Amino acid sequence: MLGAAEFRAIFVANIVSMLGSVVAAVALTVLVYQQTRSPALAASVMALSFLPYLIGGALLGAAADRLPARRVLVACDLASAALIGCMVIPGVPLPGLLALLFAIGLIAPVYQGVRSAVLPEVLPPGPRYVLGRALMRMVAQSAQVVGYGVGGLLLASLSPRGALVADAMSFAVSGLVLRFGMAARPGGATRRGSMARDSLAGLRKVFAHRPTRRILLFSWLVPACVVAPEALAAPYATHIGQPARAAGFLLMGLPIGTVAADIIAARMLTSRLQRRIIVPAALLSFAPLAAFAGSPGLVLAVGLLAVAGLGHAWAAGMDGLLIDTAPSGLRNRALALAGAGIMFTQGAGFALWGIAGQCLPVTVVVPLAATAGVLAATLLRPRRPARLT
């Protein structure tokens, strides 16, 4: 898999930029808190990082079809590096920092959408493509675990602005890797009209195709429900008599299980079996969450979350199914929309379950999220998986 030079470049660039993104979130959160001493404003940094995915995915999704992939990916990395560099300038007011964060967030769905669209050209659709997607997800999950640790180490030795400088450099390195590691490809056919109008038209066409719509909704709503215990990690740690910092251990549970699930599903299961376990695996994601009604201790809770993460094996089958189901002329749009939608709905899930946790005990909210997830997985299950040849 990593023997393919182009995929190797995309993979390495993804590692570098993902680590940089996580470190930036930690550093900017600390910087905002240092300026304001407001926990609410510091928390808004994380929330604001998800919102642009909806706007960028909807209004800029046509970039995956209209523009040369390498040029877009490199431009996105360099623009992100420049914007983060602006955050380092002393005296930038809080509204300016948040505006810069929002602008970076608008770039992210374009980058991910174009990367998703070019991946089937680098890795032909089939087992190699599914494995490549699984490796990308593993990077994203591992970055959450490793990146927070790296962010903490950087903040221990550098100021928040110093950590942001390191992050800007990571995006610049990612851009260089892509510039010299990817082949130049022409963009799609020239279209009249604005990028936003073209993107919205593509969005309507994708959602008008019922099988594709069901796949997208499944891929968005299931993760939005799974994140409930992560959204309530700190309150749950306090609920079971642990210090709030124990939330860090809870946050490691799902990513550990998810990485294991991607390895197992992509390496050990056939394409046909990957698709057959989509719904059972999704249901496995929610079964352990019901046990939170009994207030399991810290070690057991982390174990339950790791088991829930194993249920993410459903994603391997869904990757191939989306490629086969989306109409050929809409495949790039569907792939771009899938990635942007997952990020946005996970952010919305964080907000929703966090608000619910203000009104209800955490031991009620997590099982409630599990119930909602079971309903989503059951009602939106793929009805006619594409035949494999």
Predicted feature locations:
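Alpha-helical transmembrane-bundle signature of multi-pass membrane transport and export proteins
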Residues: 1-389
